[in-house]
Amino acid sequence: MFHRLLIATVVGILAAFAVAGFRHAMLLLEWLFLNNDSGSLVNAATNLSPWRRLLTPALGGLAAGLLLMGWQKFTQQRPHAPTDYMEALQTDGQFDYAASLVKSLASLLVVTSGSAIGREGAMILLAALAASCFAQRFTPRQEWKLWIACGAAAGMAAAYRAPLAGSLFIAEVLFGTMMLASLGPVIISAVVALLVSNLINHSDALLYNVQLSVTVQARDYALIISTGVLAGLCGPLLLTLMNACHRGFVSLKLAPPWQLALGGLIVGLLSLFTPAVWGNGYSTVQSFLTAPPLLMIIAGIFLCKLCAVLASSGSGAPGGVFTPTLFIGLAIGMLYGRSLGLWFPDGEEITLLLGLTGMATLLAATTHAPIMSTLMICEMTGEYQLLPGLLIACVIASVISRTLHRDSIYRQHTAQHS
């Protein structure tokens, strides 16, 4: 057992460096091509001329598509999904290393060019890839799946600064169980990855800075639970829209470069209305949490960002939809909170409270992982006082969503690429 914990520590270190490598590559490309050193794609888009804001996501999608198509022709095989660690856990625990690296590079291109897709998917993939490479050299074959799981959890912990949520992501979403024998090394890897990532970044700050001064009372629990019901209804709708957009892009029968370029062009067009559609939504989430906008502003940005996410994911842009889902949930919660705030004197606090609730519950509704979703929001924001209410709301959202839409976002993604 102790040798497993030692290996888990090594896996956590490797995962932290894999995530840091991808993050620094992003910053380098943003500096080279967008003249942006802030780390925020929204800031980069704001400072670009309209024609560059329009064309940059399309050119990034075109470059990524050419890379994927070139690799497909070179290897004479159909590309796999970018989330290969899920396939590896469901099969024999082996990776196609070269294909995974190519997809990570393609993800780097679309992410840094502004597509509304998550960068964390590629980070987690690289972390799992590093863990797999180490495991195949130093561990027996029957343990390979365990170390891939540890790498994925560690990558998630380093990307989101949420080690417990990263561990439970593996337990709830990938393993479908919470066996202690498997969970121990996973938690060790996740915690080590977070600590090493903090050392690399010279910071142990929370992912999101939130100033929530409300003390949760009976009324607030009722509002939180009602938000869970709303998210439980919105989750299946979001999954249905994503599936419909994917089918729509496929029906066009475009070559991969042109399909990804079309998705990027749609993002570019939407960015002419608001630069907030660029990127995975992290900086927009932070700005909303710092100062919740008015109802109509939230609604406008929400609609544009939703269309951008659907265009990016539907076109097949390699990357994750985890962080974009957090923004969509935040916007839904804040829209609900702003509407209710008209009837309460503390409308600002209600808006912020229900925004955080929306993040957790929509994540639970799309992943069907309520415990992970609850812990993730608490770890990212430090608002652990919300834990009891969020847990109830996330369970409700997950149950409603699972009733209306059997597949989670991950199973749907795997089915689309199978």
From Swiss-Prot:
Protein name as annotated: Voltage-gated ClC-type chloride channel ClcB
Source organism of the structure: Escherichia coli (strain K12)
Its job: Probably acts as an electrical shunt for an outwardly-directed proton pump that is linked to amino acid decarboxylation, as part of the extreme acid resistance (XAR) response.
Topology in membrane: Multi-pass membrane protein
Organismal lineage: Bacteria, Pseudomonadati, Pseudomonadota, Gammaproteobacteria, Enterobacterales
Alphabetized GO MF terms: voltage-gated chloride channel activity
HAMAP family listed in its UniProt record: CLC_ClcB
Matching PANTHER family: CHLORIDE CHANNEL PROTEIN CLC-E
Family designation: Belongs to the chloride channel (TC 2.A.49) family. ClcB subfamily.
UniProt entry tagged with the keyword Secreted: no
Cytoplasmic topological intervals: 1, 75-145, 201-221, 279-290, 337-351, 401-418
